[in-house]
Amino acid sequence: MTKKDKRTICLLGLLSIALVFILTSNVFGNTIDWYSQHVVIADALRHAIRSEGTLFPTYMKQLMGGGNIYHFSYYGYLRPDILIGALLIHVNMQTIIIAYSVLMLTLSVICCYIFLRQHTDNENICIFVSLLVLLSSIFFHSHKQIMFVNYMPYLFLALISIEKKNFAAFTLCGSMIVLHSYFYCIGCFIVCFIYLLYRYPAEWKKLFISYILIVLLTAILTIPTLYIILMNGKS
């Protein structure tokens, strides 16, 4: 990566953060879905983790009159911002989520640029497409329905890992995608598989092994969640 690329990355990052202050009011989020769901549920999740003293609490008394924590895994209860919130229990969860959402938005734009630079020497095209990412629905959902987009930087990082044939890094990125949004991980993994077949079809076995490792690493979240979904379907 050249000095010019590093300078461009810094400018894209600053522009992403500046856009948050320019296009939003005092709070990077709305009072409907964002606050009533994401902030409230995340705050309840971190308190459940603290009260039971484990990352895998079994019961949440704050929501739905009490319920299994895996009813809320759709929101990604093992996300880094929730775990950080459990450590920094005296910090407002709204502040933590806003900071994390801005970070994920910024990283999405930066990782998009880095990914594109692996394929073209035309810096202007890379900047233009990265700006399109910034101005797309990613910005909108970063302060509305955050689980729709908060996995995006990890998807770009997963594609970058495939390009570098670093399947250990891909396994880590894939696991983070699942922990952020298991609902969208299937689509992400299909994209990664298609990209691998396009770039390095002979490496498909390594990718398959990475997928198995991702399933095993995230089983503590996905298997109980699948059980809850099946039980709710029967009822």
Predicted regions and their residues:
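Membrane-embedded transmembrane-helix bundle of lipid-linked glycan/lipid transferases
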Residues: 1-235
